[in-house]
Amino acid sequence: MAIFWGINIRKTIKLRDLNHLSEIFHFYDTYIIDLWGVMHNGISLNSKAIEAVENLRANSKKVVFLSNAPRPSFKVVEFLKRLKMSDKFLSQVITSGEAAMHAINENKFGNKFYHLGP
């Protein structure tokens, strides 16, 4: 059982217990799915999660994978390929590292900043 919280244009769905994605898949056009702990455990892919994503795509749902990795998205895609994730899933991978890099390149933090971390 998972706890689900979702947003659509018309309303916010409150936290609730969710037994299966099929209970809510028709509410949304796009699903943003975390990678670590959902799609993989760092060693192997989660076959049930892969099946769920395949079902979403078969029902014309968009899927975006999100990661808090401090690396560019292409590095995470390379890692997912090593885990044997199909290329058909890898066009929409977004990382916090990629978002930060774009923000820095667009000068969204000013001219001076201090980076602390990897």
What residue ranges belong to the model's regions?
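HAD-like aspartate-dependent phosphatase fold
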Residues: 2-118
